[in-house]
């Protein structure tokens, strides 16, 4: 065959591939828009998720009612573990009914939060993992497809959990630009809304970044006490006391019992996941019975779980080291993705919609694989497990089997696998970007 004909055939095949890819990209964008439209239609039809409970907290704040009502005063499935500022953040929404407020907030909150997070991740990595537009699209798309079950669950909450992740990561971005006070304000706001974001403070302290750590603590305190303006000193003191009582309720000495009572299988935090494996604890009769490997007494199991969690933290701290050097290094971004994953593992409560916190790690792993043309072979094992968990989605295997697999905490082990992958990518990037020593003469 003539060389010119071969070249023409290659160009034609390449053109067909590009057209197919453009159609696939368009189909995915349309599908994403369709998912948003579907959930908006659900919300218009009737309120969904816990949004109405959060709206009620804002309403209670303004009318002087308790933010932490007893079981007799609130739905048995909902207990408020959030700081008082969470109610204050929802207070402006009480200008409308809970249903109308959810309709109004859904699209701006969800799209705005996701856009801010994607913008932040792009600007944190573009100098180290420069991808063309095509690969950049697929890095974000694959990350969102893997996290789709979590992203779709957060739609019922109007994207508030994506917003919390975006606030914490915007703080990281501003810190890398030496704007510590702005970063501290953003992180402090996230902490005042939900305490688990506070894990970034020990990270910055470990890295000797005193300014942003101090700023985050200061702003977290300012936002936390802000409701005193509405509630008054006496009522606010009662709010704090009741909140502490809710938090203390989870310290039963039995790892199978948390803030909400017997831990449901939908709590993907590390403590209840380990408890289901090593001790016999109370469970709801409607939930599947999982295999206990050790059947340890509750006190012994608590000590074992505490040791495992502490070991995980210490291992992470030792692997990342205390040195920062240049704040804009890619290693810092991987480390913060690891902190986001640890927040999910170490939190007392981690529901499916909280797991949108895996998105930064997923994006970094995808971007790293695209930039370096793949990942080391050993990383295929944890990556394979992460992809395998997608099969156990309710839409694929059915409600019953998905329910049974959830009882074995497959999502918890997925988060751990992502932590291993994130640290592996960090090691790969540090090794690839290290300067080559000049041979001595």
Where are these regions (language model features)?
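Alpha-helical transmembrane segments and their membrane-interface exit regions
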Residues: 168-172, 196, 223-224, 362-368
